[in-house]
Design a protein with these regions (language model features):
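Subset of outer-membrane beta-barrel
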Residues: 1-280
């Protein structure tokens, strides 16, 4: 949906867009999310545990592998390997504040790691760590209505500490506002089909500037999803289109999406996102 998910409820993936999105989740969920982007290869594992009276909790581990690099000696021979990775441990809690309003919070431990194997005397391993918080909320205009507003602030208060140089660099804070609306007119023309449209505005400040995102999701019998979206321009990349497909059978749900255009495609690697979720 063009990453316009701040007002959506996509399950465990929504933790990274808006932690409030899991507040009304009914089923426990175990999920694996995989991505291949210009930044690297990402893998996330999440477990979601809803309760009847105390809201919903989740635990997540997200690893971004930026890519192995060779260490060479003065003769150009490979003597070691550098493995830079970004690692995030996240604990999430979300709950209903009223019958219309939900809120959620992520508490994250962030590590920027550079591990090394072999001869690493000229490079050295390094771990920079920090803690940060994401907060979010979602609001239904009327209880049970098809219009939902969402807001989230990500990476609040985080500064990366370097053990080697004692530098403190702020994490890229993002502010996102958006809405999602179910278009009911399609009910008169197609049975068992729902159409939702979403849009959001993001301000990444010095990290990427401002951008907009739009998307649609067509759902058939609650089991087949066809998605399309648009990711607006910011300072890090140009505009891009997005297409996605989702399938659900019993407790298993599979989703795949791809974006086209912008910086990643121009460098020859269009981003691909794959999710496998088990609801029980």
């Amino acid at each position: 949906m063009g990453q316009a998910m701040v007002a959506g409820k996509p399950g465990s993936e929504g933790i990274w867009w808006n932690p409030a999105s899991i507040a009304e989740q009914d089923n426990r969920e175990l999920a694996i999310h995989h991505s291949q982007t210009v930044a690297g290869v990402g893998d996330a594992l999440t477990f979601v545990l809803p309760t009847a009276s105390y809201g919903t909790a989740a635990l997540s581990l997200n690893i971004l592998n930026i890519g192995e690099q060779d260490v060479t000696d003065v003769n150009g021979d490979v003597v070691g390997h550098i493995l830079p990775r970004d690692v995030v441990f996240a604990g999430t809690y979300a709950a209903n504040i009223t019958h219309r309003l939900t809120a959620g919070l992520n508490y994250k431990i962030v590590q920027i790691r550079v591990d090394c194997s072999g001869e690493c005397s000229t490079v050295g391993a390094e771990v920079r760590s920090s803690r940060a918080v994401d907060v979010g909320a979602q609001y239904d205009v009327e209880f049970g209505a098809p219009l939902t507003f969402g807001a989230a602030i990500r990476n609040m208060g985080g500064k990366v500490n370097s053990r080697a140089t004692n530098q403190r660099d702020p994490l890229p804070t993002q502010v996102e506002l958006g809405a999602m609306y179910r278009l009911k007119f399609i009910d008169h023309y197609v049975k068992d089909t729902e159409l939702r449209a979403a849009g959001s505005f993001i301000n990444s400040r010095s990290f990427g500037g401002k951008s907009v995102r739009f998307g649609t999701d067509v759902t058939y019998q609650g089991k087949v999803h066809l998605r399309a979206g648009y990711v607006g321009h910011d300072r890090r990349a140009g505009t891009s289109a997005a297409l996605g497909l989702g399938l659900q059978s019993g407790g298993f749900a599979f989703d795949i999406a791809r974006t086209f255009g912008g910086l990643p495609a121009d460098t020859g690697q269009s981003p691909v996102y794959v999710s496998l979720r088990y609801l029980f």
